[in-house]
Amino acid sequence: MTIASSTASSEFLKNPYSFYDTLRAVHPIYKGSFLKYPGWYVTGYEETAAILKDARFKVRTPLPESSTKYQDLSHVQNQMMLFQNQPDHRRLRTLASGAFTPRTTESYQPYIIETVHHLLDQVQGKKKMEVISDFAFPLASFVIANIIGVPEEDREQLKEWAASLIQTIDFTRSRKALTEGNIMAVQAMAYFKELIQKRKRHPQQDMISMLLKGREKDKLTEEEAASTCILLAIAGHETTVNLISNSVLCLLQHPEQLLKLRENPDLIGTAVEECLRYESPTQMTARVASEDIDICGVTIRQGEQVYLLLGAANRDPSIFTNPDVFDITRSPNPHLSFGHGHHVCLGSSLARLEAQIAINTLLQRMPSLNLADFEWRYRPLFGFRALEELPVTFE
């Protein structure tokens, strides 16, 4: 059975959840095709969690290994831990994890607070702002660039690479996006290789220098180090930007929940978790079966692709009471927005911290925050929940 490509319309982008419900009603593991991508589409929570934990389901790069047209892009993707299986994934993750331990993440808090206030200072007197370009994107950019070790004068370039390369891993990628991504991959790889050479000569307190310390011991190649930086730049931008902007929209669309958070800012932790569940920044992740696997009443054959719809799993009524209700006091809230198992998001604690500080500070400094008279739209991406822009007003 084929899923009609018309579901990639603006209606689907605005609200994919009714589509997810339709699939789940047929079977939580549904065999079909979407935008010419055949495979198993998983909408059930238990099924999604089970597959994410099962090492027999492997990751692979979005571009076929035999692809020759976009060789540079394919080469960069092949070096990223996101598309590595064990033991290489564990090796790369261990090397990068030092920048994202709970203690290290907590140490970023003063810089995040300072940056949030600086960005809000720029718009406070204008009585309006565009949440993404004025606030969420520059915040995410400053923070991840600071962690990686990218100089301030190069951060605009980092944003451009991240915006281009994210499109190359989505279902909706076009030849134009892949061609541009191939060019950006060359530029980003060359840039980070040069920066790595500088850090070899002059180490600093950043992630590049940290990766170089562990390079010889764990046989980290220069290209793996550069690709790790590129991956974290992409993830550090997209996840955080989408989390903050989606959260602001959710709260403004649900004034009773917004009032609850204003009256009790200590609810920010559960509020961010509910925003993650309700509008997951990452809507889909993929795996491929390494052998014939019987799971949840179906047999997935070796080589078949499995698409895990995280946004659907987060609204599975067998796990979440009233799943379509936005409730910032929801607890427990075991959403899968950051994944599950070995590939759980490395920077999840950082994204949470940025969102909590950004949202609470925004609400405190702009107590009359409202949505502008504007028809907001989502970027044409299937795997990510990403607003194009979000204008707001305030007194």
From Swiss-Prot:
<dbReference type="GO" id="GO:0005506">
    <property type="term" value="F:iron ion binding"/>
</dbReference>
<feature type="binding site">
    <location>
        <begin position="285"/>
        <end position="287"/>
    </location>
    <ligand>
        <name>heme</name>
    </ligand>
</feature>
<comment type="similarity">
    <text>Belongs to the cytochrome P450 family.</text>
</comment>
<feature type="binding site">
    <location>
        <begin position="169"/>
        <end position="173"/>
    </location>
    <ligand>
        <name>substrate</name>
    </ligand>
</feature>
<keyword id="KW-0503">Monooxygenase</keyword>
<keyword id="KW-1015">Disulfide bond</keyword>
<feature type="binding site">
    <location>
        <position position="60"/>
    </location>
    <ligand>
        <name>substrate</name>
    </ligand>
</feature>
<dbReference type="GO" id="GO:0004497">
    <property type="term" value="F:monooxygenase activity"/>
</dbReference>
<keyword id="KW-0408">Iron</keyword>
<keyword id="KW-0093">Biotin biosynthesis</keyword>
<dbReference type="InterPro" id="IPR017972">
    <property type="entry name" value="Cyt_P450_CS"/>
</dbReference>
<dbReference type="GO" id="GO:0016705">
    <property type="term" value="F:oxidoreductase activity, acting on paired donors, with incorporation or reduction of molecular oxygen"/>
</dbReference>
<dbReference type="InterPro" id="IPR001128">
    <property type="entry name" value="Cyt_P450"/>
</dbReference>
<keyword id="KW-0349">Heme</keyword>
<feature type="binding site">
    <location>
        <begin position="343"/>
        <end position="345"/>
    </location>
    <ligand>
        <name>heme</name>
    </ligand>
</feature>
<feature type="binding site">
    <location>
        <position position="307"/>
    </location>
    <ligand>
        <name>substrate</name>
    </ligand>
</feature>
<comment type="function">
    <text>Catalyzes the C-C bond cleavage of fatty acid linked to acyl carrier protein (ACP) to generate pimelic acid for biotin biosynthesis. It has high affinity for long-chain fatty acids with the greatest affinity for myristic acid.</text>
</comment>
<feature type="binding site" description="axial binding residue">
    <location>
        <position position="345"/>
    </location>
    <ligand>
        <name>heme</name>
    </ligand>
</feature>
<dbReference type="Pfam" id="PF00067">
    <property type="entry name" value="p450"/>
</dbReference>
<feature type="binding site">
    <location>
        <begin position="89"/>
        <end position="93"/>
    </location>
    <ligand>
        <name>heme</name>
    </ligand>
</feature>
<comment type="pathway">
    <text>Cofactor biosynthesis; biotin biosynthesis.</text>
</comment>
<dbReference type="GO" id="GO:0020037">
    <property type="term" value="F:heme binding"/>
</dbReference>
<keyword id="KW-0479">Metal-binding</keyword>
<protein>
    <recommendedName>
        <fullName>Biotin biosynthesis cytochrome P450</fullName>
        <ecNumber>1.14.14.46</ecNumber>
    </recommendedName>
</protein>
<dbReference type="InterPro" id="IPR002397">
    <property type="entry name" value="Cyt_P450_B"/>
</dbReference>
<dbReference type="InterPro" id="IPR036396">
    <property type="entry name" value="Cyt_P450_sf"/>
</dbReference>
<keyword id="KW-0560">Oxidoreductase</keyword>
<dbReference type="GO" id="GO:0009102">
    <property type="term" value="P:biotin biosynthetic process"/>
</dbReference>
<feature type="disulfide bond">
    <location>
        <begin position="250"/>
        <end position="275"/>
    </location>
</feature>
